[in-house]
A protein has these predicted regions:
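Short, small-residue-biased leader/transition segments that mark boundaries at the very start
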Residues: 1-6
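Cys/His-clustered metal-coordination modules, chiefly Zn-binding fingers
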Residues: 125-190
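Hydrophobic alpha-helical segments and helix pairs
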Residues: 20-81
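Active-site environment of non-heme Fe oxygenases that use a 2-His-1-carboxylate facial triad
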Residues: 76-78, 83-133, 145
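A generic structural signal for well-ordered coil/turn residues at beta-strand boundaries
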Residues: 41, 57, 82-84, 100-102, ...
Length: 190
């Protein structure tokens, strides 16, 4: 994908991001799935959370497998100390564009009972492929029903997701001015 990948979201479902090489063509691996790990490569995952405190929370982990779901699971366990299960899937069109993507994140509450943990593990292990579930037409709600089978599930709120960029020419100009002419010229020379 390149040297950098940056994704930002908000609690309002607004997402924006960029990758160092947006035109990468991800081939299938030996299992016929997208070779995400091959495209992502080695590196680090940095997570910055603005929790309304004086400074944002910053967590960093080395990528373990470069499979996004697996590395998010690792991040939650090591950086935030929250046992989690993450499953992601992407349906691609023949022209290498994304038809549909989806997934889930399930996190245990502190002091979860062993029976709860065992049931969640059983449910997650039954899900062999989020991509296949998307192909079968599962909705976010029906995906959650599979993950949380045997639990009283209640959807309190639905937050639609959207690409959102709060960038503007004025904001970029202010950022460039704050860097200073000398540093900008040095950056151009490099």
């Amino acid at each position: 994908v390149g040297s950098e990948m940056c994704i930002r979201d908000s609690s309002k479902g607004r997402v924006k991001g960029y990758v160092g090489n947006p035109d990468v063509c991800i081939p299938a691996n030996s299992k016929g799935k997208l070779d995400v790990a091959g495209a992502v490569g080695v590196g680090f995952m940095n997570v910055i959370k603005d929790m309304g405190l004086k400074e944002p929370y910053v967590g960093q982990v080395a990528l373990q497998t470069s499979e996004i779901a697996e590395d998010l699971t690792y991040y939650f366990a090591t950086s935030e100390q929250v046992p989690s299960a993450v499953g992601l899937g992407v349906l691609m069109n023949k022209d290498n564009t994304v038809r549909q993507a989806g997934g889930f994140i399930v996190q245990l509450m502190p002091f979860a009972e062993e029976s709860t943990i065992a049931k969640l593990e059983e449910n997650v292990q039954k899900i062999t492929s989020v991509t296949n579930l998307l192909e079968e037409g599962h909705t976010p709600e029906s995906l959650l029903e599979k993950v949380l089978e045997g639990f009283d599930m209640e959807i309190n709120e639905k937050v639609p997701t959207e690409f959102y960029c709060n960038c503007s020419r004025e904001r970029v100009e202010k950022a460039l001015i704050s860097i200073g002419r000398k540093e900008l010229n040095e950056m151009i020379q490099e």
